[in-house]
Amino acid sequence: MLVYSHRPEVREAVVTAVGRRPAPDLGRIRYVEASGVAEVLAACDAGEVDLAILDGEAQPTGGMGLARQLKDEITDCPPIVVSVRRADDRWLATWSRADAVLVHPLDPLTAAETVADVLRGLGSTAPATS
């Protein structure tokens, strides 16, 4: 799972909230952190991402614009979860074609459940237990 933000504390908050195993029926998650757009694009282009969580407030390129770009440009785009600072910004995440939205401050139960729901939607391509 790829976590993108230019701020390390945001990446850490996401990893901590979602946890290593968001649900008992899912395998352990291996996180890859990205602080720049080039890292996200390279990982997605290489097919190395099962799910991406993008910081909607990242700079200079925000997660919402990046989500829309990925959905438009990558044939088999992985599911994308966008995190936003304000609940009122959920509509922007919908515009970005994100598969789900997380709102800061992150609630660990909600974050884990949201990610688990998206991973379950992958069916047989969900990450394996490691």
Sequence positions of predicted segments:
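C-terminal output helix
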Residues: A13, L106-V115
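Short hydrophobic/Thr-rich beta-strand motif most characteristic of the beta2 strand and flanking loop
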Residues: L26-S35
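Conserved phosphotransfer microenvironments
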Residues: D50-K71
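Acidic, metal-coordinating helix/loop segments flanking the phosphotransfer/catalytic sites
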Residues: A34-L51
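His-Asp phosphorelay/catalytic-motif detector in bacterial-type signaling
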Residues: I74-P79
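Alpha4 helix (beta4-alpha4-beta5 surface) of REC/receiver domains from two-component response regulators
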Residues: R85-V101
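Conserved acidic segment of CheY-like receiver
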Residues: M1-G19, A52
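Two-component signal transduction core modules
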Residues: A52, V101-L102
